[in-house]
Swiss-Prot record:
GO terms for cellular component: plasma membrane. The keyword DNA-binding does not apply. Na(+) binds at residues 91, 94. This is Fluoride-specific ion channel FluC 1. It catalyses: fluoride(in) = fluoride(out). It comes from Corynebacterium jeikeium (strain K411). InterPro entries: FluC (IPR003691). It is found in: Cell membrane.
Length: 140
């Protein structure tokens, strides 16, 4: 059993990740500069969109990977979708670590603690349902 990633999968992750990171930068910059959004709000929107995309990818690939097992070319196409769109694009687009940097660079320590608690609540209350909704939309 081969548990390592193939070169094609690695290239798919790199291509998706670069595209996702560039898209995140464009959207985050646009929301902050053109609409005056605070950094945490723009990053929350980015992460919410990325989480829905991940749910869509997970839902689609989980439904179609099972059916593609009999066809080699269809199976290979399906096999590359998750590394490209799930790990790469959605992973590069979402930026939970940047949110934590924004939280921890706040000047008042009390706001840092509130930010961490707030992110934990938001992750459970918003992002998990968004992932689930994306998977439902994809038919999983």
């Amino acid at each position: 059993m081969n548990t390592g990633a193939t070169l094609i999968e690695l290239l798919a992750v790199a291509l998706g990740g670069g595209t996702g990171a560039a898209a995140r930068y464009v959207l985050d910059t646009h929301l902050k500069s053109k609409h005056g959004w605070a950094p945490l709000w723009s990053l929350a929107v980015v992460n919410l969109l990325g989480t829905v995309v991940l749910g869509l990818v997970l839902g689609y690939t989980s439904q179609h990977l099972d059916g593609a097992a009999g066809s080699t070319s269809a199976g290979e196409t399906q096999d590359i979708l998750y590394p490209l769109l799930g790990i790469g694009l959605a992973g590069g687009f979402t930026t939970f670590s940047t949110v934590m940097v924004e939280v921890f660079t706040r000047p008042q320590p009390a706001r840092r603690i509130a930010g961490v608690v707030g992110m934990a609540v938001v992750c459970c209350a918003v992002f998990l349902p968004a992932l689930w909704c994306g998977a439902l939309l994809a038919g999983a």
